[in-house]
Amino acid sequence: MLARIKPILGATAVGTAIGHLGTTMLFYPAMDAVGSGSPFPPLIENDLVASFVYVLIAVLFLDWVVQKVGRPMFNAMVMAVSQILIVDVNYVMIGRRALEPALISVVIILLLFAGAAFTYEKLSD
């Protein structure tokens, strides 16, 4: 695992930057515009720290999958689409999220995972 620390940390940094900026600059304002705030208090109050923890967990899982089967970008997109189906598509269908914030979330998730996988791949060489 120590040999993979550079790609893991790099992917986490890129994913955190994309996720945090996308969430705070696009997703939260879209949720506020439709009057849909957070129904529960956050487990981690600081948005940047929360983004970092989420992305680190996702990248560690991605690293594990890549070590088993390879193909970082493909597996990152499988993870992204899975999250989109479980959260965004389902939440729109059951009325827990408006369409505009869900579409913004889809873009953020795809960019986050693509950026993390690209960085992981480049730093693994």
Where are each of the predicted segments found?
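Juxtamembrane/disordered regions of integral membrane proteins
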Residues: 1-125
